[in-house]
């Protein structure tokens, strides 16, 4: 497949599996789950082996696909609304301030936003006024990240339940517009809680080209299954 593929399945509830191409005949394949889902870290190896054998995944993988290395797992911090953001002249950004999305585990966009916000705060307040710079940075994190974080955490809890998950996917599958914008929203082409924060509204906020322009090969495929993938 020349594009990103995402799988949802009952045993990955509040999580998902993915496949996306890399340069050459390579791909990144993996899955993520919430620690609160009841699945133990030690069970992830078993889930991984089973995931690779599922028909939906096999249909995307090349028949002769082989891993380059052993599979690995690591925790992703997602608590930007509960950790210190500064310590005098030190500003915490990215993973250091747990700025990741509670739904997807995505953290690259949050790292860029928090890093840029820290630099802008220092530039605005001046290098000799750390207290003022810290206050500017705190406000920027609240504006850009905290509302999105809390909204994503709320939605993640809804998706933990079968009725909520099925309802969300049915709504996303209504038409081409909802499918396209669900994929863009899920992977944060625009802020998670954009519709709830009018201060961030702008003309064309749902129609821009996004992080990557479509080269004609397709952008994203979302697959829903009522049984394991």
Which ranges hold each PLM region?
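FAD/FMN-dependent oxidoreductases across multiple families
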Residues: 13, 35-122, 127
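Active-site substrate-recognition segment that forms the wall
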Residues: 6-38, 92-93
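Residue-level detector of alpha-helix boundaries and kinks
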Residues: 4, 100-103, 107, 153, ...
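Short secondary-structure transition/capping segments
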Residues: 33-52, 170-188
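FAD-binding core/adjacent interface of flavoenzyme oxidoreductases
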Residues: 1
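C-terminal helical "tail/cap" subdomain of flavin- and related membrane-associated enzymes
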Residues: 120-229
């Amino acid at each position: 497949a020349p594009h990103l593929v995402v799988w949802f399945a009952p045993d990955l509830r509040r999580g998902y599996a993915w496949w996306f191409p890399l340069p050459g005949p390579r791909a990144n394949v993996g899955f993520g789950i919430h620690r609160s889902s009841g699945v133990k870290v030690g069970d992830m190896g078993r889930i991984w082996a089973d995931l690779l054998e599922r028909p939906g995944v096999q249909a995307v993988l090349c028949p002769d696909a082989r891993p380059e290395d052993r599979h690995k797992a690591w925790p992703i911090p997602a608590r930007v609304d509960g950790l210190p953001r500064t310590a005098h002249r030190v500003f915490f950004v990215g993973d250091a301030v747990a700025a990741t999305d509670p739904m997807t585990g995505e953290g690259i966009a949050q790292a860029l936003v928090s890093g840029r916000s820290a630099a802008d705060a220092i530039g605005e307040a001046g290098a000799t006024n750390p207290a003022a710079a810290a206050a500017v940075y705190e406000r920027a994190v609240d504006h850009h990240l905290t509302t999105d974080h809390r909204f994503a955490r709320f939605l993640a809890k809804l998706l933990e339940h079968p009725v909520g998950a099925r309802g969300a996917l049915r709504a996303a599958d209504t038409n081409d517009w909802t499918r396209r914008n669900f994929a863009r929203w899920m992977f944060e082409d625009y802020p998670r809680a954009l519709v709830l924060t009018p201060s961030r509204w702008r003309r064309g906020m749902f129609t821009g080209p996004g992080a990557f322009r479509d080269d004609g090969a397709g952008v994203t495929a979302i697959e829903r299954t009522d049984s394991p993938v």
